[in-house]
């Protein structure tokens, strides 16, 4: 089949718009051919368990799944009794971008708090972590954070540890939505375990689709006492792949070989972050030099996303050539996301287009 899409089309709507990294495609091809046992009893999934233990510690156990919503819902279900609830930021993906799946599929009550930067703090968790033992209130038993957040901000290991300590002191657990965990790791310049298992996270989702995989994520259990029934929940939630070797092969490609200094997850995420930083710095310079007016940034640029407000009509005109999303139409806030395959030329051309629209 010949390509149906324009190979030159570029955009900043989402890292989900990007293609598949060539090293991931090679890993899929390498795993192809012959027969392997289905449903995760293959050699690739067995090796994946070892590699996740290498990255997160000997206690880690990984469950490959199809997508991020499935990873979050299934992981959280495994952490909660039927009367349990999750405390999250209002901007959290589980609250605002999963179509009600946690509630409808998982039967999970989400208790939200408002956070200006998408990050939770112990003080914010306190707003919902109450009513323990009250049969009239869903019991807040899990705190869920996103790393990096939906607003492009990144938790430090110390911030994660503070939330984990608070949760554990109250008999709660800490869950991490790691759809962009690679971008957080690249931003922090730290091993994955430094802000996950070493910081007290109990269960996380390890994202790959936004970082160059074809599809697939993994639920990673870091404290086995915090989770139960995942083997069965993955099946009942329709997240059990029969040909799991092709999910596991992609994750193996992302995590790299033993001793590899810069595995694919890090190289891809570091590049995406660098392109977001390039976009931010070029626009900062244009504002400072007085070449453009009307643009204001709304969040720090710490990972691979840039948030800004634009004057009325500008976003629609820019979208004639570059796809991106409105984040808050009422205020003119937009989101620009960079990917592993965003080039410097892409950034420079987009910056030039913005400068033409906002020329002083």
What are these regions (language model features)?
Residues 2-321, 326-342, 350-358:
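Conserved PLP-enzyme active-site core in the AAT-like
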